[in-house]
């Protein structure tokens, strides 16, 4: 078990989610507001906003919170956030990409650098690790919509590059350029996805021992706890034994 799905499942284990739910809601609301402000407040015409709303629903964010975040984008006195990316290294030479939204670059850079340093990592220059990742689209469906063969056939026909299917559902990966077309084709067949968006996917993953793995997970948790941080992407894989321990 390795890669993006493994990491996502670990970071969303129950205890972790319960402990940071209010902070998660705040970050989701910010992304919804930013997406609505950059485009149209109509999710049918704004793919980024639609993806943000799906992410909020997946976390059981109340409908009122979602609608309030969209309306906030129309306010003249609302904060102006910009997207920014940081790159760095963790224990064992693992690579990390951090996506943040900030209204103060200096504050966010200082917070992210401190998070790296406190947990045995180091912040690097932009471009230092991005070449190890691909910017791709991901469209996720629950396992109940189709069996693995049916989803694979539909995804390839739609122009996707890869499909991962299991008990947790189906995760379709496609090139960034074909993200819109693939999403539309899959929706026509299976309905609205559970989750969709653009991510940084590691081209290759490195295996780390359990001691290093625990340090890396701690590093990611510290980074994710920063208010301005939206997503963290990694290129390491953990042993099945450590995964089971972390999910217990």
Swiss-Prot record:
- Predominant subcellular localization, coarse grouping: cytoplasm
Offer a single GO CC term for the protein. Answer: cytosol
Coiled coil ranges (UniProt) are none
Q: Name one GO biological process term.
A: regulation of DNA-templated transcription
The domain of life for this entry's organism is Bacteria
Keywords tagged on the record:
Cytoplasm, DNA-binding, Transcription, Transcription regulation
Entry annotated with the keyword Transcription regulation: yes
Recorded family membership: Belongs to the TACO1 family.
Name of the protein this chain belongs to = Probable transcriptional regulatory protein Mrad2831_3553
Query: Organism, per UniProt?
Result: Methylobacterium radiotolerans (strain ATCC 27329 / DSM 1819 / JCM 2831 / NBRC 15690 / NCIMB 10815 / 0-1)
